Regions:
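Glycine-rich phosphate/diphosphate-binding loops that line cofactor/substrate pockets in enzymes
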Residues: 1-2, 54-58, 63, 89-101, ...
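N-terminal amphipathic/basic leader segments beginning at the initiator methionine
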Residues: 2-55
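Active-site histidine-anchored catalytic micro-motif
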Residues: 6, 11-13, 27-28, 77-84, ...
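Short acidic, glycine/serine/threonine-rich loops at helix termini
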Residues: 17-21, 73-76, 113-115, 146-151, ...
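Cap/lid and interdomain-hinge subdomains that line or gate substrate/regulatory clefts
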Residues: 60-62, 71, 109, 136, ...
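Extended hydrophobic packing segments that form well-structured cores
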Residues: 63, 85, 271, 382-497
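Charged, often glycine-rich, active-site loop that binds/positions anionic groups
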Residues: 65-86
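Hard-cation-handling environments
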Residues: 202-402, 407, 411
């Protein structure tokens, strides 16, 4: 009789500092077989899981539930109660009927009434599925693995790339560990080394930065049969929760000593590089003044308002400074403003409107009044260039106001590539200046053809100026929030052997 393996998931990255709560309606929810059906052919964790499981030859894949949303503010009470209930209820028919479970999670989820959603789901899943059933889950490199998660799971497969491109590979690693447990009887022992550091900046790019050295080392260990999974999480500095930190997580086949050895090596090397892992931010006024004198194209990285990190997407800070100083070049600017979209749709294509843009959601931004022509409108639904998601921005319009072209969305979406522009008939290469609301994108999207990428010190709920955010929940002292932080490596061991 074939082994039945269950697949389920719940994932969202959150910025605690985004004042707008997420709701249930922000999530794409799938039930039953459609969880797998929707993932097939995509670079997704579930697709990676399925590929490995299908290669076993003696596995029946079943799926129960998946809920995923664009990064945003914390999930509100009602939304969390519904998603957690649906997730757990979906597992109950499989109690006593499966050989193992794989969960696709994020690690930086947070809710109005629950600071460790993934930990809660794993704890309750264990109660439903039983203590003997192996459970392995995936997490983002920006996830915040907690003691509760590790206590109730057998292992975790963490992304090895930033910017993220190894979604399917991470799912595959989770599935391989699960099959080794079921088929070969390996005994997972997890070693975690928390590091009191929150980091940002170009040195975190795994292909080129210092952080990539630690990730490459841990990735190389997967050739060793003693290693079931090994990864490094830098947390999400914008998810202010009790166990927020950077951390190494190594899962071995019952070899605690080896797990300690490799985890400590990676952790200590990372700590030694901490002062290099920060963003070199350019003051807003200087950024605009510098770009105004350049031939272009110029990329303005507005990571402080990156929806992919949990921001609201309605910052107008860079454009406001451009308007104030009479910026002479063409500008392509994405922004979330549902009320402006409504006005534009009512007016129709080629209509002239006067609207206030920005600050509709996050009140730290002051709306700016613009007179604009409605160029186009769309339903805001499109696939990203490399990520495995379909974005749903809601009704979307393009507005032209003098030298400014605004792509105005009804809802925040991932702005990690050029797809939001292409989907609305715009090519970023046709503009002198492009505002990119993401900390980092694949080089081909902007960096490779722009004269300069200016990482702007703008306000926002995902600012790389971490001291500006106001953490109140995470453990302290924490680098760089506090001075003279010491790191005394203390490995924590979790085992269900």
């Amino acid at each position: 009789m074939a082994k039945r393996i269950l697949i389920a998931g719940a994932a969202q990255e959150v910025s605690t500092f985004n004042p707008v709560f997420s709701t249930y309606e922000d999530f794409n929810v799938s039930f039953g077989d459609e969880v797998v059906e929707r993932a097939l052919g995509k670079n997704s964790e579930v697709a990676g899981m399925v590929e490995v499981l299908q290669g076993d030859g003696d596995v029946e894949i079943v799926s129960s539930y998946s809920a995923g949303a664009t990064s945003a503010g914390p999930l509100d009470k009602a939304g969390w109660e519904r998603i957690s209930s649906e997730f757990l209820e979906s597992l109950k028919p499989f109690a006593g009927e499966i050989a193992g479970a794989l969960f696709a999670m994020h690690g930086s989820m947070s809710a109005e009434t629950e600071l460790d959603p993934e930990g809660y789901l794993l704890e309750e899943s264990r109660k439903i599925l039983g203590e003997e059933i192996p459970i392995v889950y995936t997490q983002d490199i920006h996830g915040v693995t907690t003691a509760k998660m590790l206590k109730h799971a057998d292992g975790v497969a963490v992304y090895h790339t930033y910017p993220h491109v190894d979604f399917a590979d991470s799912g595959a690693r989770a599935a391989r560990q699960l099959l080794r447990q079921i088929n070969d009887g390996v005994k997972p022992v997890t070693v975690r080394v928390p590091i009191p550091a929150l980091v940002r900046g170009e040195q975190l790019i795994t292909e080129t930065g210092l952080f990539g050295n630690q990730v490459s080392y841990l990735k190389s260990l997967h050739d060793d049969p003693r290693i079931l999974n090994a990864g490094f999480q830098i947390g999400n500095p914008f998810t202010d929760v009790p166990e927020l930190c950077s951390q190494v997580i190594v899962v071995t086949d019952n070899d605690e000593a080896f797990g300690r050895e490799v985890a400590l090596k990676a952790a200590n090397e990372f700590w030694g590089n901490r002062f290099e892992m920060h963003a070199d931010l350019v003051p807003l006024e200087e950024a605009v003044a510098t770009a105004s004198k350049m031939k272009g194209p110029i990329e303005f990285s507005d990571a402080a308002d990156a929806p992919s990190s949990g921001a609201s997407g309605d910052s107008n800070a860079i454009v406001a400074e451009m308007i104030r100083t009479g910026y002479p070049h063409t500008v392509l600017a994405p922004i979330v403003d549902p009320s402006a979209v409504v006005r534009a749709v009512e007016k129709g294509i080629d209509g002239r409107i006067t609207v206030k843009l920005g600050g509709n959601l996050d009140k730290r931004f002051t709306p700016i009044e613009v007179k604009a022509t409605v160029i186009s409108a769309s339903d805001g639904t499109f696939p990203l260039e490399k990520w495995p998601s379909i974005e749903h921005a809601g009704p979307t319009v393009v507005l032209q106001s003098d030298n400014y072209t605004f792509v105005v969305f009804s809802r925040a979406i991932n702005l990690v590539d050029r797809a939001p522009f292409f989907a609305n008939g715009l090519d970023p290469k046709d503009f002198h200046s492009i505002i990119v609301k993401s900390p980092f994108c694949e080089p081909e999207f902007f960096d490779d053809w722009c004269e300069l990428n200016i990482i702007v010190d703008a306000p926002g709920s995902t600012s790389a100026d971490l001291l500006s955010l106001g953490h109140t929940i995470c453990a302290r002292p924490m680098f760089p929030l506090d001075d003279d932080v010491e790191f005394n490596a203390e490995p924590q061991v979790y085992s269900r052997v």
